[in-house]
Amino acid sequence: MDPNCSCTAGGSCACPGSCKCKECKCTSCKKSCCSCCPVGCAKCAQGCICKGASDKCSCCA
């Protein structure tokens, strides 16, 4: 698994929760690259943690 999660710039993240992205360029989650974050979540860049298999994360819930 690529630790940097090379997401397409401006695209949506599809990285697993176990992936610690360092260079994710997704607009939805710039830092943590959480797949559970909705598009347009302004708090994702602060670092979010996906809650299990749910579609919510700690910063966007």
UniProtKB/Swiss-Prot annotation:
Question: Which residues are noted in the entry as a divalent metal cation 3-binding?
Answer: C15, C19, C24, C29
**Residues that, per the record, bind a divalent metal cation 7:** C50, C57, C59, C60
Task: Report residue spans for region: Beta.
Answer: 1-29
A single GO cellular-component term from the record reads: cytoplasm
Where in this protein does the record say Phosphoserine is found? Answer: S58
What are the GO MF terms of this UniProt record?
zinc ion binding
Positions modified as N-acetylmethionine?
Answer: M1
Q: Which keywords does this Swiss-Prot/TrEMBL entry list?
A: Acetylation, Metal-binding, Metal-thiolate cluster, Phosphoprotein, Zinc
Question: Which Gene3D superfamilies does its entry note?
Answer: Metallothionein Isoform II
Q: Which PANTHER family match?
A: METALLOTHIONEIN, METALLOTHIONEIN-1G
Instruction: Give the similarity note.
Output: Belongs to the metallothionein superfamily. Type 1 family.
Q: What is this protein called?
A: Metallothionein-2
**Source species of the chain:** Stenella coeruleoalba (Striped dolphin)
